[in-house]
Amino acid sequence: MHLSEITHPNQLRNLSLSQLRSLARQIREKHLQTAANSPVGCHLGPGLGVVELTLALYKTLDLDRDKVIWDVGHQAYAHKMLTGRYHNFHTIRQKGGISGYLKRSESRFDHFGAGHASTSISAALGMAIARDRRGENFKVVAIIGDGALTGGMAYEAINHAGHLPKTNLMVILNDNGMSISPNVGAIPRYLNRLRLSPPVQFLADSLEEQLKNLPLVGSSLSPEIDRLKETVKLVTAVQNNKAGIIFEELGFTYVGPVDGHNLAELLDAFELAHGISGPVLVHVATVKGKGYPPAEAEQVSYHAQSRFDLATGKPYPPTKPTPPSYSKVFGHTLCKLAERDPRIIGITAAMDTGTGLDKLKEKLPDQFVDVGIAEQHAVTLAAGMACEGMRPVVAIYSTFLQRAYDQIIHDVCIQKLPVFFCLDRAGVVGADGPTHQGMYDIAYLRCIPEMVLMAPKDEAELQRMVVTGIQYTKGPIAMRYPRGAGVGVPLAEEGWEPIPIGKAEVLRSGGEVLILAYGSMVHPSLQAAEILKEHGISTTVVNARFAKPLDTELILPLAQQSRLVVTVEEGCLMGGFGSAVGEALLDADIRVPLLRLGVPDVWVEHATPEESLAELGLNSVGIAERIRAKVEALQGQRASQAQAILGSS
């Protein structure tokens, strides 16, 4: 059977092992061809590692009834191909195409959407409890990676499920030893020992079957069989690094470890697990990037890939040179400063490469901490370090810092601790879509007392703000910066001067329209000013630098002299930078028209950053068009008012 003929996952139920193996090969081929030719890139390693797992599991389920919850979602590419999306799989992560993650609105087989890690067991348990309350009996399966299992939420769900012995729930642990980078911590180390242990549950259940088949006495031995099963499991566990005992003690029946690329073994394990009452965990050992040697060899870089040569695995060179990314400039600058200040500690939550902290990890490993997928712990860990005089720098994507909001308020801000938050991927992130957009940090941080917010206009100003953040000791401070390449300005290797807290700068003066731009929107605003000049509209452009505190000493007098004030930000309008300016104008009783440009109250779907910014009107052309339309509308209003005055006289 060809993969293109699969329109419903239940078609797998009647296929032979050889047919499943053929589908596994086809899935990998389709995935690789799509990744190699994608204009926006896509996740690769995670999906290649779960092909056999997906096929074997779906063969044992009735997916018209049963529900599978995938953690994060970037490991669910085979799932997408098997659930009616094969023919448009080539559009994945592109504007108007299918999502790179699971979306309930995209398919009836996507039972729970996710882009952040560690949520699957909680969601699956909720569905299982609801099922039992309604008296139904479908199966619920959560598939979670060992990286996501470093997140505390996963253990909260396991703790809850373990106290519900009558609630049937299967958790499949997809253990490849990686998140994006290699996993850290005691739990991954424990799981790695389990990967090397022979199956435990198989031994116990095999013994039970043999004893029950004894003539005359087999059926009367149930209590003794149970005790003997436990003895076998305990003895086996002790001999094999106590395999699975943690999960057993938490109330789960442990099955595994199972070879995640052996279809026959997977089928046996899943059928066995389906027959076990209560919560069960199936431990499946997989290889990230399985079936594509370059991805198996370079598991970090092939977690996700842009266009590459399928024959060699090497990425195609860029069509033109690009400036270094904000992340790389941040990592380089922090590393330079850390070399001279041993108090500086870089902290990340399983994203050392993505945040640029890999350079610090390599050069100064004693000044680098990776906590795993544990943002809450990262923030409070930093708070504890700050209490002891260290200078913790928490580098986290804007979207992931949301997960530690209580810790920011309760553990950092209330205590006025000098923790420096560096929010990568702030604003539009592109093909990852709404689960990863960094739209909300200005709003959710601006409302917190003691918090300082800043954003650089370019990569050179970012270097100065890194110094500013480290030197600021009066309380918490946050810096946001976008994904991707910098503007292309010259960069100094040292001698970066801090920026005075709350001080903006005028970049262009003398206009009747005042443009207050924040962070990544400064350069598009300067370009928009040139476009407006061609239409006879003069502008003053200010690099705000700080959303909190605002430079009211600079902004308010300029606003009083202007016919229109415009704020531009790459973030949500509700509660954002524009709201801060509006509040300041209102408090000062300055009555001037205000145009706020930013992200409206909508979810921004996946597309390239350029496509998203154009659609939002946040590129130079869009900014100029919105301002020009507003100026013309105001001129029309003034003309109408003047005409009304003349008419009344």
Curated annotation (Swiss-Prot):
Mg(2+) binds at residues 146, 176. It catalyses: D-glyceraldehyde 3-phosphate + pyruvate + H(+) = 1-deoxy-D-xylulose 5-phosphate + CO2. Gene3D superfamilies: 3.40.50.920, 3.40.50.970. Its EC number is 2.2.1.7. Homodimer. The lineage of its organism: Bacteria, Bacillati, Cyanobacteriota, Cyanophyceae, Synechococcales. Thiamine diphosphate binds at residues 74, 115-117, 147-148, 176, 292, 375. It comes from the Bacteria. This is 1-deoxy-D-xylulose-5-phosphate synthase. It comes from Synechococcus sp. (strain JA-3-3Ab) (Cyanobacteria bacterium Yellowstone A-Prime). NCBIfam families: dxs, PRK05444.2-2. GO terms for molecular function: 1-deoxy-D-xylulose-5-phosphate synthase activity; magnesium ion binding; thiamine pyrophosphate binding.
